[in-house]
Structure formats: C-alpha cells, structure tokens
C-alpha cells in the first residue's frame, strides 16, 4: 500500500483554497465583489452568446423564458431575459423617448434650447449704445422691450452717464446700488418673471430691441411729454361743424 507523502490536512487546505479561488466572488466576499462577478459573467455570456445560444433549440429558449416568470417580476421580465439570454447588439443606438413623439420632443427641445440661448444673449447684451440725439445718455439694449410694461421701460431703458471724477464715482456707486436693490428678493417672483419671459419668447420670438421699441413707441425723444405730442396734432374739424358753430345764435 502506497502512502501519500502529503498529510491529509494539507490536501484539504489546498482543495479549499482552490474552491475559494474558483468561487471568490461568492464565498465570503463583499457585495461589490458579487456585482463584479455578475458583470464578468455577463461579459462572458455576451462574448460567447452567438456560439452557445445558436446551438440551443427554440423550445429550450421558450421554456427558459417561461420559467423566468416565476423568478422575476412582470415589469422586469424582459430586462432580466435580455441580461441573461439575449446577445449584445453589435452597433448600439440611442433609444428614443416613449413619452412624446419624435417631432414634438425635438421641437420642444429645440424651443427650450432657443430660449436658453435667448436668455444668455439677453444677460450678456447690456452693452452701451449711445443715442445720437442725446449725447449725454446711453441706451441699454433689451430684447424684452416688447413684453415689458410702460413703467418698466421708462425706468430701465434710459440711464444717465455719470460724469468723470470723484462725483461721478459716487453717482455710479449710487446708481449700481439702486440697480441691486431693484432686483427681485423672493424666489417666487423671479420664477414668475422667468415663466412670463418664456411665454413671451414663445409668442413673439427673439426680436431686436430696436424693432420692439419702434413698434411700441413713436420715434420721439423719451423725455418729451405726451401733451406736447398732442399739441402738435390739432384735431381737424369738418366744414359742417364749422358752419354749425358760426350759424348758432348767441
């Protein structure tokens, strides 16, 4: 009888080490080890799925899919079957959203991108454009001129240029402090203002401030009172009314 040179304890230790090495992602490991092992198995299955599943008969695949009903939930049945038995796509394509049709989704995405571009250009378009009729002032360009009320246009469209020197520095500090204090303090007001701006953008579209001001106001000086405009245009009386005034008895 031939006796082995290695003791039994060493043989058991080696076999246990081999078993633990073969199944290291399942025996006494942490959850991320199990997830890495599942990813390895899925990668191996995707690599050899064409050779393995092509040899399987169709009945075996159908029975495997039917048995998966008792193991997974109905809403995850197809996903689990695709993870285990379906082959990976050679050329994956981005999936479309099923919430909206493609035309409506693309149009809404395009309109939102246009609105964001319009908002960014509006924030960056406060460049000074001096008016030739008034050399002491400058006009700030605004693409929302057609959607603002009359009071906001009068208070935001014209700004006096501060004179140079220490007095001009004090005036500019007071001017910028007034601008900061006029900003909305509550988030609900700013959110409502943004929603109104977006609705105005959808209805009117991005137009230049010069076109909006020409449509909303006549081409006159902004400080000219309304009474002077009305004085220049006297109402013309018809000849019948003039005759009635002259022929009336006193």
Curated annotation (Swiss-Prot):
Record keywords: Mitochondrion, Transit peptide
Tree of life domain: Eukaryota
Coiled-coil portions: none
Basic and acidic residues bias locations: 136-146
Biased composition (Polar residues): 241-250
Organism listed in the record: Homo sapiens (Human)
Transmembrane segments: none
Name the record gives this protein: Protein GDF5-AS1, mitochondrial
Lineage: Eukaryota, Metazoa, Chordata, Craniata, Vertebrata
Any one GO cellular component localisation term in the record: mitochondrion
Range of the transit peptide: 1-48
Subcellular locations according to the entry: Mitochondrion
Region feature Disordered, mapped onto this chain: 86-108, 124-148, 204-250
């Amino acid at each position: 009888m031939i006796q082995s040179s290695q003791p039994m304890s060493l043989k058991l230790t080696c076999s246990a080490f081999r078993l633990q090495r073969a199944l290291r992602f399942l025996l006494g490991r942490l959850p991320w080890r199990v997830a890495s092992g599942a990813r390895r198995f899925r990668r191996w299955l995707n690599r050899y799925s064409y050779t393995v599943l092509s040899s399987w008969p169709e009945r075996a695949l159908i029975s495997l899919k039917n048995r998966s009903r008792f193991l997974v939930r109905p809403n995850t049945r197809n996903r689990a079957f695709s993870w285990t038995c379906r082959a990976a796509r050679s050329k994956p394509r981005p999936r479309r959203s099923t919430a909206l049709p493609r035309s409506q989704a693309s149009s809404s995405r395009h309109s939102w991108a246009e609105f964001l571009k319009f908002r960014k250009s509006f924030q960056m378009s406060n460049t000074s454009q001096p008016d030739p009729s008034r050399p002491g002032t400058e006009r700030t360009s605004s693409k929302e001129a057609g959607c603002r009320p009359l009071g906001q246009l009068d208070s935001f469209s014209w700004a006096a240029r501060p004179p140079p020197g220490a007095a001009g520095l004090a005036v500019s500090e007071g001017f910028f402090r007034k601008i900061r204090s006029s900003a909305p303090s509550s988030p609900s007001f700013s959110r409502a203002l943004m929603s109104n701006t977006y609705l105005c953008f959808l209805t009117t579209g991005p137009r230049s401030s010069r076109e909006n001001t020409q449509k909303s106001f006549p081409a006159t000086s902004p400080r000219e009172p309304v009474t002077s405009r009305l004085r220049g245009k006297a109402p013309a009386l018809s000849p019948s009314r003039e005759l009635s005034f002259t022929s009336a008895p006193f």
